Amino acid sequence: MARTTFLVSVSLFVSAVLARTVEYNLKISNGKIAPDGVERDATLVNGGYPGPLIFANKGDTLKVKVQNKLTNPDMYRTTSIHWHGLLQHRNADDDGPAFVTQCPIVPQASYTYTMPLGDQTGTYWYHSHLSSQYVDGLRGPLVIYDPKDPHRRLYDIDDEKTVLIIGDWYHTSSKAILATGNITLQQPDSATINGKGRFDPDNTPANPNTLYTLKVKRGKRYRLRVINSSAIASFRMSIQGHKMTVIAADGVSTKPYQVDSFDILAGQRIDAVVEANQEPDTYWINAPLTNVANKTAQALLIYEDDRRPYHPPKGPYRKWSVSEAIIKYWKHKHGRGLLSGHGGLKARMMEGSLHLHGRRDIVKRQNETTTVVMDETKLVPLEHPGAACGSKPADLVIDLTFGVNFTTGHWMINGIPHKSPDMPTLLKILTDTDGVTESDFTQPEHTIILPKNKCVEFNIKGNSGLGIVHPIHLHGHTFDVVQFGNNPPNYVNPPRRDVVGATDEGVRFQFKTDNPGPWFLHCHIDWHLEEGFAMVFAEAPEAIKGGPKSVPVDRQWKDLCRKYGSLPAGFL
């Protein structure tokens, strides 16, 4: 990994504060890897999976040069990178979703994403946002450190070793899985933590060669930054014999909240402090999948104070018995729902319940009588708590109903399955000459215009009849989740996220339209996104084109579409 930093004086700050420009080079290529012991072709970042940690400090500017060296004709050969959770103020052109904010990067070309970080801090991640490509390995962690972190007194260690990127893993390429239309193939074969896992954990030794190992010293406190980079899997995370104190969710600092375990959906991040206060030994880091049967991820926590040779943890790891609703989901039948498109650009543009195996102290420390699982509704923001609209009604309420067409296999919002346009939404807005209206977008683009400087509430419900939780992600914003299902609303101190779980019972959240850009809203189950579970909100389109919050684009951004338009029709 190539990385350089240099200091740039920023005269806009009062007291001559210095901000850095932090540069990275990411080479995207194909290669064979076996993170769970089974070899397959994958899409790699700098030769590995997951990609390297990208990190910077509050106020820095990130410059990431992405080089496309993809060659495998059986996998996706163009690419595009999304920086999940970065707000991208005046910078929507570098948000990354293909055909929303940019054209893909073609093979043997490069593109440099330049991203001023402003006041953002916290745990994020980056991944391909071209079709289902990130399922094949193109994903990695991203952390923005805060030199004045309000939680700094709660932990001693916060470094690259305490970043845990967890994710499901497949032995078949995502392109091949989608081509079959067989939903059962969307179940992952295994899961990894920091690129290590066991396909057959009952018959594969648990040791530092097969599992990620976090070494700790007794008496020290460690800030874990847990990232769920999955295509579908949700996990329940715990550490054998240890409690954790949650201090952030999706990059938002929260009031400290002590738990024994927490659930984490695809796309979400949880920061939690664990104190190494047990007897020096080896302990399981457990992460059973909660929406896929008989799959689990593990890592090892080893005390450096333990002078004995390596020995595995006492007792088996945790497993999970999925609910009847999850079993029903994996048994349901639907048609082929792939909505790829993109082939016409050249012509258009030219230019459940826990199942414990073995000793109960795997979950509960000795003498404990209860196990505390994180309640998401108790994640209170540390700074500026309260709903975006305050105690007043929202200026605009948008009702969104998701569901699935069991005949076609398409997931839909308000009856429309999203299909990526041939021309990126941002380019269409920037080249419009007579005022952007919703009629400028085709029905499959499913694009709604949001007025600027309003408080908006999304009311999202489902009618699929399938009991799976959909992780809903909105680009360009964090939002305040004011109601989960039929629970009482909370406008005083609701959780603030950028990914929230939605069932058919629904979820409501609020945000202010203070960031002009075309922002993608979609299910972060990548299979559902590919089957149409998405739409675009064109926020303040006239402000995108001109004014103090406009989105300036450069020649290299424009060249992306020129180069992509020269590819053969259907090349992706």
Swiss-Prot record:
Residues that coordinate or bind Cu cation 1: H82, H473
UniProt binding sites for Cu cation 3: H129, H475, H522
Domain Plastocyanin-like: 21-145, 157-304, 422-540
Cysteines paired by S-S bonds: C103-C561
Tissue specificity annotation: In mycelia, at a lower level than LCC4.
GO MF annotation: an example: copper ion binding
Positions bound to Cu cation 2: H84, H127, H524
Localization, UniProt: Secreted
Record flagged with keyword Amino-acid biosynthesis: no
Residues that carry a glycan: N182, N228, N294, N367, N405
Keywords from the named record: Copper, Disulfide bond, Glycoprotein, Lignin degradation, Metal-binding, Oxidoreductase, Repeat, Secreted, Signal
InterPro entries with a match to the protein in the record: Cu-oxidase-like_N (IPR011707), Cu-oxidase_2nd (IPR001117), Cu-oxidase_C (IPR011706), Cu-oxidase_fam (IPR045087), Cu_oxidase_CS (IPR033138), Cupredoxin (IPR008972)
Keyword Signal: yes
Major subcellular site: secreted
Pfam hit, one: Cu-oxidase_3
Any one GO BP annotation for this protein: lignin catabolic process
Binding site for Cu cation 4: H470, C523, H528
Cofactor annotation: Cu cation
Entry note: cofactor: Binds 4 Cu cations per monomer.
Catalysis performed (reactions): 4 hydroquinone + O2 = 4 benzosemiquinone + 2 H2O
EC number: 1.10.3.2
Signal peptide location: 1-18
Role played: Lignin degradation and detoxification of lignin-derived products.
Family according to the record: Belongs to the multicopper oxidase family.
Subunit description: Homodimer.
Full protein name: Laccase-3
Source organism of the structure: Thanatephorus cucumeris (Black scurf of potato)
